[in-house]
Structure formats: structure tokens, C-alpha cells
């Protein structure tokens, strides 16, 4: 009886294993969840970011030689897919209607430490990413610009 009770509890509490297919988001329904920095914010943070001696000693001063390079790097806002599963930092210089009209151009899977990233690429360097500890696979040989529906990934235990 005790074993039966344990088995029932384990079946209801433990996550169910199995692969789930994930599709890259349609950007027409993407939502901006972060705000774009003001010019004053960028100028203020440029001074602080580029005056960090540790960064200079590591030789990481590329964006500190020109404010426009720094602005290009830091003038971004956080966006999410409509369901909140994918997110991206998108340049605030990219018009919203251009972002929302962007079509999927590629999909790939990458590892970063113990995390797996499913990276969906769009024009203008836009990349929406899904992060998970699960194992994911994607067919990188598919041309997503021709048939976006064929660009899927399979992730163990994905939402």
C-alpha cells in the first residue's frame, strides 16, 4: 500500500518526461517589456562604463573609444514573445513596425554552461531566445525564410 501511494504521488508531482515541439515566435505579436534608455541615460552610463579600470586592464575598451559604438551596444530594450517564452534585447533604433514585420530566417541550438538556448534569428540581427536546462535539438539545415513553419525544435519537457 505504501509503495502504491508513493507511485501515485510521484506520478502527479514529478515533471513528465517527453519531447515537446517549440516553434519560433511570430514577431507581429511580440511585446516590448523594457523601456529604451534616454540619451541622458546613455551619456551618464557611458562615463561610468568606460571609466571602469578593470575593463581597461582586460583590454575591453572597444566601445569606449566612440560614444556612437557604445550607444549602438547599449541602446536596447527587452522584448518578449506573446506567451513570454522567448525574449530578446532589440535595438531601440529599429522601428517597431519593422520588428513586427520581420520574418524568421534561422533557428539553432547552443549551449551556455548548463543551459540550452534555442535561438530564433530574424533580419537586422534580432535574435529571440528560449532558455532551458532541457536538451533541445533543431534541424539547422532547413531554410526558415522559405518555410518558417518547418523551423521547429524539440525540447525534453518544454512548456
Which role does the model predict for each range below?
Residues 20-159:
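Mitochondrial intermembrane space
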Amino acid at each position: 500500500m505504501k509503495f502504491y501511494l508513493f507511485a501515485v504521488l510521484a506520478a502527479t508531482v514529478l515533471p513528465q518526461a517527453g519531447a515537446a515541439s517549440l516553434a519560433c515566435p511570430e514577431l507581429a505579436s511580440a511585446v516590448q517589456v523594457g523601456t529604451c534608455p534616454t540619451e541622458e541615460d546613455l551619456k551618464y552610463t557611458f562615463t561610468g562604463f568606460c571609466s571602469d579600470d578593470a575593463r581597461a586592464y582586460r583590454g575591453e575598451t572597444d566601445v569606449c573609444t566612440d560614444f556612437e559604438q557604445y550607444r549602438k551596444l547599449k541602446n536596447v530594450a527587452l522584448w518578449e514573445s506573446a506567451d513570454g517564452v522567448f525574449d530578446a534585447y532589440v535595438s531601440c533604433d529599429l522601428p517597431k513596425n519593422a520588428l513586427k514585420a520581420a520574418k524568421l530566417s534561422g533557428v539553432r541550438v547552443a549551449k551556455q554552461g548548463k543551459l540550452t538556448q534555442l535561438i530564433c534569428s530574424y533580419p537586422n540581427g534580432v535574435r529571440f531566445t528560449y532558455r532551458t536546462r532541457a536538451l533541445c535539438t533543431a534541424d539547422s539545415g532547413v531554410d526558415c525564410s522559405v518555410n518558417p513553419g518547418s523551423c521547429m525544435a524539440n525540447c525534453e519537457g518544454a512548456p
